[in-house]
UniProtKB/Swiss-Prot annotation:
Subunit and partners: Interacts with MRG1 and MRG2. Component of the NuA4 histone acetyltransferase complex.
Purpose of the protein: Histone acetyltransferase which may be involved in transcriptional activation. Acetylates 'Lys-5' of histone H4 (H4K5ac). Essential for gametophyte development. Involved in DNA repair after UV-B exposure. Negative regulator of flowering controlling the H4K5ac levels in the FLC chromatin.
Protein's UniProt name: Histone acetyltransferase of the MYST family 1
UniProt keyword terms in alphabetical order: Acetylation, Activator, Acyltransferase, Chromatin regulator, Metal-binding, Nucleus, Transcription, Transcription regulation, Transferase, Zinc, Zinc-finger
PROSITE patterns assigned: MYST_HAT
Organism per entry: Arabidopsis thaliana (Mouse-ear cress)
């Protein structure tokens, strides 16, 4: 880095100066003075060469890899994704949009030149988009945090679509949003209408989800907005928690705005503009000011594959409170009331599978612990609304299934069940089914 090189030079320059003032060396060996002068000249030469080399790499090309100082004060490897000219600066004065290669893409950000260690620059690579966004070298705390805050969206993308998606969405267009009492840093690109291309921050009405460019616009809107909760029917109320069912066809603008908002925190997902086909279940914390959205899930009105959940999100300020687990559990309670088995939309990401595997493990093993006698996978499916294939894969992953005489047999030793239940973690908030007031969706003629 430039700063460390300057410090090192100052220290070396000071050395002959102190020798010159030392009576023991002042008039000593001429060779020693000559050597000191040579060190000084060499150091200055190296310093100039280093400075020229660092300046010679500017401006950095897209694809360049370099070390960058992050919020923790430490340097981490990054890849330059995009750059933009700082028109108030000099010829090589750019800001750079970087991806921290050790971390998830949601931490990508614009950084200034002084955050970069130019001595660590590696030549730009000729690559369009990485095949996968890496998430390497995570501590156990970071891994747990990502597991718990992971959000599952509409379709996962195949490899070709993934590359195209990453190229199109490589730079976050909105840096922050204001929603209710929170200012939230966004994670990913969201395809807002073109008139919002120049916005770094958006202001959302937390009740109708209309979004504006300026705070004053939001303040004027809030004086006129009559909503104090999401549109649609309140289908659940327990203490300060409420759930609202919103029909995408009846409340199209709200549903579309919800999708724009959600995409800021969802990666590698398809944003569905045809919201008519979906029902949205909005979870809220309620107080005397109204019902404040903390998260939601969506589901297709009619799914041939028996999907009971298409997209799920807990907003960042409300994560790690058990709301994600609550939303998953609620989707299965709806399936029970429909008299159907359900499963989340496929394919699941690795972390999405972790979330669901945890839910399935807790539900199934709790039943097996309490049940006396034999029980079949079909009976478990009927009791839980979990699809038989999900039950089988979960129990197989826990090594609780054996194949005997042409059929699968569940082997449930109590100590083994306790060990797996402990590993699955807490179940989060309970859904009090006695507080649900809901009837399955029927298309109106």
């Amino acid at each position: 880095m430039g700063s460390s090189a300057d410090t090192e030079t100052a220290m070396i320059i000071a050395t002959p100066a102190s020798n010159h003032n030392n009576p023991a060396t002042n008039g000593g060996d001429a060779n020693q003075n000559h050597t000191s002068g040579a060190i000084l000249a060499l150091t200055n030469s190296e310093s100039d060469a280093s400075k020229k080399r660092r300046m010679g790499v500017l401006p950095l090309e897209v694809g360049t890899r370099v070390m960058c100082q992050w919020r923790d004060g430490k340097y981490h490897p990054v890849k330059v994704i995009e750059r933009r000219k700082n028109y108030n600066g000099g010829h090589n004065d750019y800001e750079y949009y970087v991806h921290y290669t050790e971390f998830n893409r949601r931490l990508d950000e614009w950084i200034k030149l002084e955050q970069l260690d130019l001595d660590s620059v590696e030549c730009a690579l000729d690559e369009k988009v990485e095949d996968k966004v890496t998430s390497l070298k995570m501590t156990r705390h970071q891994k747990r945090k990502i597991d718990e805050t992971h959000v599952e969206g509409h379709e996962e993308l195949d490899a070709a679509s993934l590359r195209e998606h990453e190229e199109f969405t490589k730079v976050k267009n909105i840096a922050t949003i204001e929603l209710g009492k929170y200012e939230i840093e966004t994670w990913y690109f969201s395809p807002f209408p073109p008139e919002y291309n120049d916005c770094v921050k958006l202001f959302f009405c937390e009740f109708c989800l209309s979004f504006m460019k300026r705070k004053e616009q939001l303040q004027r809107h809030m004086r006129k907005c009559d909503l104090k909760h999401p549109p649609g029917d309140e289908i659940y109320r327990s203490s300060t928690l409420s759930m609202f069912e919103v029909d995408g066809k009846k409340n199209k603008v709200y549903a579309q705005n919800l999708c724009y908002l959600a995409k800021l925190f969802l990666d590698h997902k398809t944003l569905y503009y045809d919201v008519d086909l979906f029902l949205f279940y909005i979870l809220c914390e309620c107080d005397d000011r109204g019902c404040h959205m903390v998260g939601y899930f969506s589901k297709e009105k009619h799914s041939e594959e028996a999907y009971n959940l298409a997209c799920i999100l807990t907003l960042p300020p409300y994560q790690r409170k058990g709301y994600g687990k609550f939303l998953i559990a609620f989707s299965y309670e709806l399936s029970k009331k429909e008299g159907k088995v359900g499963t989340p939309e496929r394919p699941l990401s690795d972390l999405g599978l972790v979330s669901y595997r945890g839910y399935w493990t807790r539900i199934l093993l709790d039943i097996l612990k309490k049940h006396k006698g034999n029980i079949s996978i079909k009976e478990l499916s009927d009791m839980t609304a979990i699809k038989a294939e999900d039950i089988l894969s979960t129990l197989q992953s826990l090594e609780l299934i054996q194949y005997r005489k042409g059929q699968h047999v569940i082997c449930a030793d109590p100590k083994v069940l306790d060990r797996h239940l402990k590993a699955a973690g807490r179940g989060g908030l309970d859904v009090d089914v006695s507080k649900m007031i809901w009837t399955p969706y029927k298309e109106q003629s």
